[in-house]
Amino acid sequence: QVLGLEVIAENYRQERDSYKLDLRLPCGSQIELFSFANPPQRTSRPEACGLRHLAFSVDDVDQVVVYLIAQKVEVEPVRVDEYTGKKFTFFSDPDQLPLEIYQG
């Protein structure tokens, strides 16, 4: 809800003791999220190698940061990409997966 995603479906998969959540983004794209009772430990720093975070393009990073803070989300200080000159920052989802917002 904080990110404005619509829940399409949420299903419990008993054989795996896990949930699958289908979400629709405002642009119409969909994301599938899975939960697992005992996932393996892994590095989840934003700059770790491999798939370790999701990034969302936004028009105004500062405006989204104000909104997230109002929703009681802890947000890292906004940084500026040294190559593009565009703003970005990170925050964490409830499972501590880093999420990024960057200036589109």
Question: What does each model-identified segment do?
Answer:
Residues 3, 53, 100:
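Short catalytic micro-motifs in class I SAM-dependent methyltransferases
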Residues 1-29:
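Core segments of cupin and vicinal oxygen chelate
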Residues 9-10, 16-19, 38-44, 77:
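A short, acidic/glycine-rich surface segment
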Residues 30-32, 98:
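Short hydrophobic-acidic sequence motifs that mark active-site Asp/Glu residues
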Residues 21-29, 43-104:
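Vicinal oxygen chelate
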Residues 15-17, 48-50, 83:
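Residue-level preference for beta-strand/loop junctions
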